Amino acid sequence: MRFTSEQLLEDGVLEREFTLGEIPGTLWTTPRSAPAPLLLMPHNNGLPKADPRLVARGRHTAAHGYAVATIDAAGCGERPRSAADEQARAELRRAMRAGEPVDEIFESFVGPLVENAAPEWRTTLDALLELPEIGGPVGYAGGWTALGIRLAVTEPRIVAAGFFAGGYVPRAQREEARQVTIPLLFLLQWDDEGNPRQRALDLFDAFGSKEKTLHANLGGHLGTPAFEAEDAGRFYDRHLK
């Protein structure tokens, strides 16, 4: 892991850009006398790690005593998409304009994205936990639920997860959800135009966790109330501090 820039922000948060091989990422930390617990904050849908909403979440969470990391997966930020990914997305746009079913198209490119991103996140986690200022435990706090399910099942260092029911979850991850046993907070926007409500409720029901909490709020995809950040903070404090 090589740090390429750093900036001390007004709230005392240190924001550092890093590269790990071909993986670009951002790490937010604050000065602490002891190593900080770590929150992984993945994103997808082509968003860059510099997306303002993601950066605001990272800084806010770090200011409350966590180390927070995000990376650009393939196809996000400046990382190129594969030809197959570009073709699938073009077909998705065509099908949506025509009002045709899109599940199989989502399946064709979201599944491979998860398969490719999970090893990169494990590599990133290995490198982050070697830093003296980070000691764990580790939580998942990303909007990319499909990736979170895969990591919650395959990465024992992750001990709690917060998911947002706002994107397509491939069949493989819907099956894997039954193997998720860590404490779970699941956010659902009741009127999310891109995520069928019943499918999200079925996914919540499938999770095998004995401690799982569903927070449902009225509104569309971008309408999550600000107070959910406070509730999420209490959830992570219980399990990571």
Predicted features and spans:
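Serine-hydrolase catalytic machinery in alpha/beta-hydrolase-like enzymes
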Residues: 38-133
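Acidic catalytic loop of the alpha/beta-hydrolase fold
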Residues: 190-195, 222-223
